[in-house]
Amino acid sequence: MSYNGIGLSSAKGSSTSGYVQQSLAFTNRKKDPRLTTHDKEQQQQQQQQQIQPAKDESVISHKAKRQIELLVSEYRDKLEDGPDDLSDDTIDSKCEDYRRSILEGNEQSRSQN
């Protein structure tokens, strides 16, 4: 009464006939044409995602500016939390100098490339 080890060894006392039915929830991906076309489409989408277009120059420059502002913000936090009691004007001027030095460093590295 069992099929491939599935089912009851004996239907006696189980209140069933012991008949084993095929699971309708199981689908064979290789035989179902709807699923194979979906898989092909998914593979094509993954391949298209791997081939990325050239990034826009404005996006790259914006990310670089954000990175610079992050460094300046961390520097400002360090100055504000430091043991020296600096005024806001002094901190602002030091942050501006730091920002200019970073920008000059970036321009020099671009001119070398």
UniProtKB/Swiss-Prot annotation:
The species this protein was found in: Kluyveromyces lactis (strain ATCC 8585 / CBS 2359 / DSM 70799 / NBRC 1267 / NRRL Y-1140 / WM37)
Keyword Heme attached: no
Listed name of the protein: Pre-mRNA-splicing factor CWC21
Compositional bias annotation for Basic and acidic residues: 29-42
Compartments where found: Cytoplasm; Nucleus
Domain CWF21: 60-105
Superkingdom of the organism of origin: Eukaryota
GO cellular component: cytoplasm; spliceosomal complex
Swiss-Prot/TrEMBL keywords: Cytoplasm, mRNA processing, mRNA splicing, Nucleus, Spliceosome
Ranges of Polar residues composition bias in the record: 11-26
Free-text function comment from the UniProt entry: Involved in pre-mRNA splicing. May function at or prior to the first catalytic step of splicing at the catalytic center of the spliceosome. May do so by stabilizing the catalytic center or the position of the RNA substrate.
Biological process terms in GO annotation: mRNA processing; RNA splicing
PANTHER family according to UniProt: SERINE/ARGININE REPETITIVE MATRIX 2 (PTHR36562), SERINE_ARGININE REPETITIVE MATRIX 2 (PTHR36562:SF5)
Biased amino acid composition, Low complexity: 43-52
Similarity-based family: Belongs to the CWC21 family.
Binding partners and assembly: Associates with the NTC complex (or PRP19-associated complex). The NTC complex associates with the spliceosome after the release of the U1 and U4 snRNAs and forms the CWC spliceosome subcomplex reminiscent of a late-stage spliceosome.
InterPro entries attached to this UniProt entry: CWC21, mRNA_splic_Cwf21_dom
Keyword Secreted: no
Lineage of producing organism: Eukaryota, Fungi, Dikarya, Ascomycota, Saccharomycotina
Region described as Disordered: spans on this chain: 1-61
One Pfam family matching this protein: cwf21
